[in-house]
Amino acid sequence: MTSKSCLLLVAMVTLTTSVMGTAEVMSHVTAHFGKALEECREESGLSAEVLEEFQHFWREDFEVVHRELGCAIICMSNKFSLLQDDSRMHHVNMHDYVKSFPNGHVLSEKLVELIHNCEKKYDTMTDDCDRVVKVAACFKVDAKAAGIAPEVTMIEAVMEKY
């Protein structure tokens, strides 16, 4: 094996391990965050059907479009002190929350960056629930593109821990 081939192999293994690590951490974050969903169902006006669908947030066919989802995400985020008073992400608290999971440090910077970039896109929207559902949809697309979105099976595997 030439030195160039060896370097390429090391780079590919490192990148794959990094992406797999962040997706695994994201599965923990998703499972833990999702535990607040039932508590927030009534407060946000989430129907039983949308509640059931929301359990599959990361699936390709799940569309993040319902205003009530935005309201539920606000409620859930407030349970963990992840938002400021204006319903925008509290960067320090979000970093700390993500870092509280095993290997969370490998994900926190990227997750906060992606959410912040999505928040900037919809900053002029005045309805918090509408804005947050748009931010969530944007984040889902960007997280998948960045390779940090977890597989549904990964989330199911860690659900019992939370």
From Swiss-Prot:
GO terms (BP aspect): sensory perception of smell
Cleaved signal peptide residues: 1-18
InterPro entries membership: Odorant/phero-bd_Lep, PBP/GOBP, PBP_GOBP_sf
Gene Ontology MF terms: odorant binding
UniProt keyword annotations, A-Z: Disulfide bond, Olfaction, Sensory transduction, Signal, Transport
Disulfide bond residue pairs: C40-C75, C71-C129, C118-C138
Tissue: Antenna.
Coiled coil (residue ranges): none
Role played: Present in the aqueous fluid surrounding olfactory sensory dendrites and are thought to aid in the capture and transport of hydrophobic odorants into and through this fluid.
Family: Belongs to the PBP/GOBP family.
Protein name: General odorant-binding protein 2
Originating organism: Heliothis virescens
